[in-house]
Amino acid sequence: MIIRELKGIDEMVDQITVLNELYPDLNQEEYAADLAEMLPHNYGQVAVFEEDECLGISGFWIGRKLWCGKYLELDNIVVCSKHRSKGVGKLIFDYLHNKAKENGCTMIALDSYTTNYKAHKMFYNEGFAPRGFHFINILDDTGVRG
């Protein structure tokens, strides 16, 4: 298995089938439009491959907040169902942990649905701990996935 950062919209859109495991209704046009807005704001993606097959993917953001300084936020960690429990998620976490350190980040953050217990176990195993709540107030649910 190899892990590498995906560069540009076309390379990211090429891996949409992995994201479709999480968002089955996401299509290429909509995904490309979202990426066009996200990429200029410190968004990136990392993917794990075995030969030409993408086994897992994660988006990430590097930003700064008053309360924590510079941080890296994981966004949509998805491992193909047929490749779970093979170390794909661990490879993604390790890569992004090193990227955060190389970029001078003080912490790594992520959001998770409260009912995603399998993911919670993995997050705990990777040293994450719940520190607060992520409250939302949906203003228009037409753009909300998941």
Task: Show the residue positions of the predicted features.
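Glycine-rich phosphate/pyrophosphate-binding loop shared by adenosine-nucleotide-utilizing enzymes
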Residues: M1, D52-I57, L72
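A conserved beta-turn-beta hairpin within the catalytic core of GNAT-like acetyltransferases
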Residues: G63-L74, R84, P130-R131
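Conserved acetyl-CoA-binding loop-helix of GNAT-fold acetyltransferases
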Residues: V79, S85-N98, N125
